[in-house]
Design a protein with these regions (language model features):
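Short acidic/histidine-rich active-site segments
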Residues: 41, 155, 221-224
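Catalytic cores of alpha/beta
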Residues: 83-89
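An N-terminally biased module of ancient metal coordination in phosphate/nucleic-acid-related enzymes
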Residues: 1-83, 148, 159-173, 181, ...
Length: 224
């Protein structure tokens, strides 16, 4: 099977990314990529801080770049859709991700900061971080059922601030049971993103973890 150089989890200055769309295209071309997919954050009305800011301008720029660079690289228009986000009417692919936990109609981010995560655990789960992990993977299962994404993003994001077991024991029966339950909820041949964001930020290894990756391989998942 040939190796395809591609990335579809790409944020730009139209949401919470640091580089323009054209800069990302130029970088992908310079690296010999076959495909680059842009995936703006879907709009979440309860927290618009990181979401797409001007969808129509974004689409105009995307179409301009696809016309200009289309003979060199395949450009795709996608969305990173949260469980509570709004799905655009037109897109080439959907990355499904869980960024929030819900309690009594309110949503709390799981990956904003370690301090914020502790506040979530203390406020929502009375200090029981494993309960937070169980809720997270329950929402991953719900994502698989309701959103049915083309790609599953940063599958075990709940562990982002858990280096060295700072909040919970990833070897515990409770954690492994919750995570495995989420893996078992995936459809046959599900595509899982290998996300290196934590590795580059010095916050741990790749996402998903080695253990979950092995479970996913056994379940017939695919990776990108």
């Amino acid at each position: 099977m040939p190796f395809i150089k591609s990335n579809v989890h790409t944020h730009t200055t139209f949401c919470d990314g640091q580089d323009s769309m054209e800069d990302m295209v130029k970088a992908a071309v310079s690296l010999g990529f076959d495909t680059l997919g842009f995936s703006f954050h879907s709009y979440t009305p309860f927290d618009p801080s990181y979401c797409i800011r001007d969808y129509y301008e974004y689409m105009r720029e995307f179409e301009r770049l696809r016309k200009e660079y289309g003979q060199t690289i395949c450009l795709l228009n996608g969305v990173e859709l949260d469980l509570y986000g709004e799905r655009p009417s037109v897109c080439d692919f959907v990355i499904g991700s869980v960024h929030y936990l819900e309690e009594n109609g309110r949503r709390y981010p799981v990956d904003f900061s370690a301090r914020g995560f502790k506040k979530l655990v203390d406020g929502m789960f009375r200090g029981d971080a494993l309960a937070a992990a169980e809720r997270y993977y329950a929402e991953v299962r719900e994502l698989a059922e309701k959103v049915k994404p083309d790609v599953y993003g940063h599958f075990d994001l709940i562990t982002r601030f858990n280096q060295g077991g700072a909040f919970f024991d990833e070897e515990s029966a409770r954690y492994k049971s919750a995570a495995l339950s989420a893996v078992e909820s995936l459809p046959a041949g599900a595509v899982i993103e290998v996300n290196l964001g934590r590795l580059f930020k010095g916050e741990g290894g790749m996402c998903p973890s080695d253990r979950l990756t092995r479970e996913m391989l056994s379940a017939g998942c695919r990776f990108m």
